[in-house]
């Protein structure tokens, strides 16, 4: 497995298994299959509605939690300090873990400043190993970077032939 080292020294696998659009009733089986063929980085999100299936797979796979790099994202309906804190605790409960390897703000909408403050607190408490953002354009990324006490470790951006993200790449 190849890794990238984040800005805080945490090593993240370059290849991960994402469960976007995986129906909740299929998530456990799909993640168990992914683990069986060697995936150790699992990417989910509150908005996907399948965190519980990921947690069930991790609990049933027979491997220790430390073998995995687990990522989830705070959805825009949970933006703001208090709502984000509650949603992070809820995500950890659904995932069956007492820590996350990476937590991202899913999109730059709502009070993402409050969301990021909540994430920083979890990071400082040792409940999150790395924090960052997702789908932030260069302007929003610079904004949060200047606001943050803890710089984002990553800006996860969807990239494919139909969405090439040329501006984000140039930045």
PLM feature segments, named:
Residues 22-35, 79-95, 114, 139-143, ...:
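Short, acidic/polar
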Residues 1-4, 52-59, 88-90, 138-141, ...:
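Alpha-helical scaffolding within the catalytic cores
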Residues 73-121:
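Glycine/small-residue-rich loop that forms an oxyanion/phosphate-binding "nest" at active or ligand-binding sites
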Residues 20-22, 45-47, 73-77, 105-108, ...:
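Active-site beta-loop-alpha junctions enriched in small/polar residues
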Residues 60-67, 95-97, 123-127, 147-151:
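Short helix-capping segments at alpha-helix termini
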Residues 107-171:
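Beta/alpha (TIM)-barrel catalytic core signal, keyed to glycine-rich beta->alpha loops juxtaposed to Asp/Glu
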Residues 1-68:
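N-terminal binding-site loop/beta-alpha segment at the start of enzyme catalytic domains
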Residues 17, 34, 42, 54, ...:
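Conserved, mostly hydrophobic/aromatic
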């Amino acid at each position: 497995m190849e890794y990238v080292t984040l800005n805080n020294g945490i090593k993240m696998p370059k290849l991960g298994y994402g469960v976007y659009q995986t129906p909740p009733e299929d998530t456990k089986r799909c993640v168990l299959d992914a683990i069986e063929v060697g995936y150790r980085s699992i990417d989910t999100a509150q908005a996907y509605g399948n965190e519980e299936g990921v947690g069930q797979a991790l609990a049933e796979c027979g491997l220790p939690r430390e073998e995995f790099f687990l990522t989830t994202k705070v959805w825009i309906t949970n933006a703001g300090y208090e709502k984000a804190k509650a949603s992070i605790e809820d995500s950890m409960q659904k995932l069956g873990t007492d820590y996350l390897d990476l937590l991202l703000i899913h999109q730059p909408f709502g009070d993402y400043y409050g969301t990021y403050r909540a994430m920083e607190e979890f990071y400082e408490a040792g409940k999150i190993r790395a924090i960052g953002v997702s789908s932030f354009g260069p302007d929003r990324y610079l904004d949060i970077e200047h606001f943050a006490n803890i710089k984002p470790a990553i800006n996860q951006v969807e990239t494919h032939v139909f969405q090439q993200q040329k501006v984000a790449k140039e930045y």
